[in-house]
From Swiss-Prot:
Alphabetized UniProt keyword annotations: Amino-acid biosynthesis, Arginine biosynthesis, Cytoplasm, Lyase
Organism placement in taxonomy: Bacteria, Pseudomonadati, Pseudomonadota, Alphaproteobacteria, Sphingomonadales
Catalytic activity: 2-(N(omega)-L-arginino)succinate = fumarate + L-arginine
Protein's gene: argH
Natural source organism: Zymomonas mobilis subsp. mobilis (strain ATCC 31821 / ZM4 / CP4)
Name recorded for this polypeptide: Argininosuccinate lyase
Principal localisation: cytoplasm
Length: 468
């Protein structure tokens, strides 16, 4: 039964207990089902700690060698067979320590000298998040590369730009894709900033107050690739800012991926028809044989909500905790692990979609031409050529749009006679600005949609990414 009381207590901490925990206590207390993912970081941290203990003559070189060989054997076992889930041992630290004792005997107990699970798990978790950031950055770099390559192909491809999902002004597809390149650049910057902040080692902070042993925290920090040890032992074991930083950066990235996914979904719908989805990232319907559903994009959009939920989960866990370690903090890892898995998959899916989408320039151009998207160009022409205030030009242009709409024609299809009837200051030269190509080419300010500007930004991006 789940409420059956166990008579054995945990050998690692049970000396002051007269009886063991109930089965339900073992279940709620065990983190090994998820923190086994930390095994590589846990062994790396233990090796760094061990070498420091030996160098400071806190344990003998003979015991140190036994422990090191035991840790190597355990790492090989985990790599081959996975980490055993012994709930009675609670977590990855105790599972590894028990296995080490089985292999080398009592010398295993010396490894935990001058160390607590509090600083141990903080160290492991920081190392894991640091590795996760590096993996995400690699994925985001691949996505940026795909965006840049496709943007270069379509630097001059005209499409409608939208506000409120209403046709606004003509832009280029390359310009649109490069907007997402910029978003992902900020995402990478946020992850990079978080990596810099986390890169201080909590190892040696012990339970919360430091240790009376003559340890060298700078040595272990350097061995593990940290910039320095943390400066306050209490903060060291209390801190999960690095996990929250990761989740907040992941959430912002997921928002950007979701927006791109939403646009792909819209563009692939029949009323738009701007893109054709690749079979590899689409699914069909069980009842409607004609369907090609944008499921990969929809799942990226869906995953973004779950990632935001992971962030909120850890925020709620941490918001009311007193300093040092509380068992609530055992729940810090599942949301980070889940968010990382979801984000990594979303990035890979989006990269694959961008690489293989078929864009349909003819439909994009036709839609841009049909939506009065050059109305602003007419207003700008009136300001420049007729010298009238923009608000008056705006009103005149609105009248021209209304007339074209009544006639069922595009704005540039209005005759000069039609335009002069609206305002006699309009002359033949206005025709030069009313085509979508002229409109796009005129937006040549820095960062604008003119093909020359788009190509310049692509060149900058290729240099940043190290592309030839």
């Amino acid at each position: 039964m789940i409420t059956e009381r166990q008579t054995d207590s945990n050998a690692m901490w049970g000396g002051r207990f007269s009886e063991g925990p109930t089965a339900i206590m073992r279940e709620i207390n065990a983190s090994i089902p998820f923190d086994k993912r930390l095994w590589q970081q846990d062994i790396a941290g233990s090796k760094a700690h061990l070498k420091m203990l030996v160098s400071r003559n806190i344990i003998t070189a003979e015991d140190g060698q036994k422990i090191l060989e035991g840790l190597d054997k355990i790492a090989a076992e985990y790599a081959e067979k996975g980490v055993p889930e012994d709930w009675s041992l609670e977590d990855i630290h105790m599972v590894t320590e028990k296995r080490l004792a089985d292999l080398i005997g009592s010398a295993a107990g010396r490894l935990h000298t001058a160390r607590s699970r509090n600083d141990q798990v903080a160290t492991d978790f920081k190392l894991w998040v640091r590795d996760a950031i590096d993996m995400v950055d690699k994925g985001l770099t691949a996505l940026q590369t795909a965006l840049v390559i496709r943007a270069e192909e379509h630097a001059a491809t005209v499409m409608p730009g939208f506000t409120h999902l209403q046709i606004a002004q003509p832009i280029t597809l390359g310009h649109h894709l490069m907007a997402y390149y910029e978003m992902i650049s900020r995402d990478r910057s946020r992850f990079s900033d978080g990596r810099k902040r986390l890169n201080q080692s909590p190892l040696g902070a012990a339970a919360l107050a430091g240790t009376g042993f003559n340890i060298d925290r700078h040595q272990t920090a350097k061995a593990l690739g940290f910039d320095a040890p943390t400066a306050n032992s209490l903060d060291s074991v209390s801190d999960r800012d690095f996990a929250l930083d990761y989740l907040m950066s992941a959430t912002q990235t997921a928002i950007h991926l979701s927006r791109l996914a939403e646009e792909i979904i819209i563009w692939a719908s029949q009323p738009y028809g701007f893109v054709s989805l690749p079979d590899a990232y689409s699914t069909g319907s069980s009842i409607m044989p004609q369907k090609r559903n944008p499921d990969a994009a929809e799942l990226v959009r869906g995953h973004s909500g779950r990632i935001a939920g992971c962030m909120n989960a850890l925020v709620m866990t941490m918001k009311g905790l007193p300093l040092a370690y509380s068992k609530d903090m055992q729940d810090d890892k599942p949301p980070v692990f889940e968010a990382h898995d979801l984000l990594s998959l979303a990035i890979a899916a989006m990269t694959g979609m961008i690489e293989t989408l078929t864009f349909i320039p003819e439909k994009m151009r036709k839609t841009a031409e049909a939506g009065f998207s050059t109305a602003t160009d007419l207003a700008d022409w009136l300001v420049r050529q007729a010298g009238i205030p923009f608000r008056e030009a705006h009103h005149i242009t609105g009248s021209a749009v209304r007339l074209a709409e009544t006639k069922g024609i595009a704005l540039d299809a209005l005759s000069i006679e039609d335009l002069k009837a609206i305002d006699p200051r309009i002359d033949e030269s206005v025709k030069a600005v009313l085509s979508v190509d002229a409109s796009v080419a005129s937006r040549n300010s820095y960062g604008g949609t003119a093909p020359d500007q788009v190509r310049a930004r692509i060149l900058d991006a290729k240099k940043t990414l190290g592309l030839n």
